Amino acid sequence: MAALTRDPQFQKLQQWYREHGSELNLRRLFDANKDRFNHFSLTLNTNHGHILVDYSKNLVTEDVMRMLVDLAKSRGVEAARERMFNGEKINYTEGRAVLHVALRNRSNTPILVDGKDVMPEVNKVLDKMKSFCQRVRSGDWKGYTGKTITDIINIGIGGSDLGPLMVTEALKPYSSGGPRVWYVSNIDGTHIAKTLAQLNPESSVSIIASKTFTTQETITNAETAKEWFLQTAKDPSAVAKHFVALSTNTTKVKEFGIDPQNMFEFWDWVGGRYSLWSAIGLSIALHVGFDNFEQLLSGAHWMDQHFRTTPLEKNAPVLLALLGIWYINCFGCETHAMLPYDQYLHRFAAYFQQGDMESNGKYITKSGTRVDHQTGPIVWGEPGTNGQHAFYQLIHQGTKMIPCDFLIPVQTQHPIRKGLHHKVLLANFLAQTEALMRGKSTEEARKELQAAGKSPEDLERLLPHKVFEGNRPTNSIVFTKLTPFMLGALVAMYEHKIFVQGIIWDINSFDQWGVELGKQLAKKIEPELDGSAQVTSHDASTNGLINFIKQQREARIQ
């Protein structure tokens, strides 16, 4: 594929931006077209609620959207989409298919990898997960002293942690009758020490989530959990009732002391950051029940079908991706804010921080050459309204343009005080995108200050500070209610957005070589931290840091 910057469709888009980009003004665009909302929004109608994607508050015209869709076609998005769904090895650096869509393929139509249908294996693992969940949640699965299981400790990192953690937090209202779930990821001993201090080994089950069963952070934490358990249990054979593995390495799982019957398999075509739909989601299923886990899969499958079959110009993941391309590659935006107005989604931005930045944080193309344009953005965000009192100042009046996605459910899980809290939340959600779009003109600010009775001197002094330029782009994503089905659909929508952008940039969204170098160097440094001898084998900075740490390890603190 030709470089993006040499693609005629991209050049056409850039030329339009150079000639007209500075003239784009959202107030004027809305004034000129009273039907703008209808022209630049989509409603996705499912049998489990509706999703409105309003992208009318973006710096686009119908001509721009046509050019963006033409760019997607020129970059081969449709063909690449089919290659993914057909099980081709689109993760070309690792020689792997990319089939998280198979994990939630509720239609059960065959999906082939190397000529073999993967669906029987997918369904076999789902059945095993269902059986295990039912046994634990019903109290049939007992600990070594006969106690029912009240707590699940999920030990993993990256995709084995962020996805399940985000989903169990998001679906807390659906957890009735399930065990509590705790997540341990950080190698920092504080994380596991604080967690285990609250738990009883007799009624806890640890899930060790590691594809290879060699991930240093996960296995170190798992061994610590086993030590903690055996301090009480004394008998290594009791491990079988309290530890399960999510892995592909049967040998290592057995060596750890886990019965292979308690090992839940997944496959090399499941990427870590796309794995919550697999056995990695066992903690989700235990917490909210397997029926709700299946609803999560069904919502994602619904979005998969929308993504695969809907024309590009009406395709939610594609449109979100193209708007991102517009801002990153024409306007030069470097960050993207995800702002869910739902406290249950408080880990949503963190989840897609990995999903997006580990996928598209690349500068080498499929042909092995360095890109000559920007790729993945910095993704960040916090739930509303907390963010309004933290960083929205910069979004409104800072010097950087930050495209934002605002998300909110129409119906709350907690309609307390006759829905007052949610009404205030909705009002703030709506006000923010309007404020970012409209801003406040000098004349409007002047009238406001005059009405407040300011003296002419104070008015002139305050006036420039009270002006909002506006013209800040946002997407509003409004959905009926945060249910398992709806969450699955939203997560899949963003997954496919990331995929589309990777295709347009001609990078591999499904490897993560950038994670490896630091891990390699850490293995070399770890033994150098032993003893008190000065270290001189690195650059001056790293040597200085190591030697300071050695010196301060034994320091007495007053």
Curated annotation (Swiss-Prot):
One Gene Ontology biological process: glycolytic process
Residues that bear Phosphoserine: 107, 185, 455
Localization per record: Cytoplasm; Secreted
Modified residues annotated as N6-(2-hydroxyisobutyryl)lysine in this record: 34
Coiled-coil regions, chain positions: none
Positions where Phosphothreonine occurs in the chain: 109, 250
PROSITE patterns (alphabetical): P_GLUCOSE_ISOMERASE_1, P_GLUCOSE_ISOMERASE_2, P_GLUCOSE_ISOMERASE_3
Modified sites of kind N-acetylalanine: 2
Modified residues (N6-malonyllysine): 454
SUPFAM superfamilies, A to Z: SIS domain
Ranges that cross the membrane: none
Catalytic site: 358, 389, 519
The UniProt record lists the keyword Phosphoprotein: yes
Subunit-structure text: Homodimer; in the catalytically active form. Monomer in the secreted form.
Reported function: In the cytoplasm, catalyzes the conversion of glucose-6-phosphate to fructose-6-phosphate, the second step in glycolysis, and the reverse reaction during gluconeogenesis. Besides it's role as a glycolytic enzyme, also acts as a secreted cytokine: acts as an angiogenic factor (AMF) that stimulates endothelial cell motility. Acts as a neurotrophic factor, neuroleukin, for spinal and sensory neurons. It is secreted by lectin-stimulated T-cells and induces immunoglobulin secretion.
Record's protein name: Glucose-6-phosphate isomerase
Organism for this UniProt entry: Pongo abelii (Sumatran orangutan)
Gene name for this UniProt entry: GPI
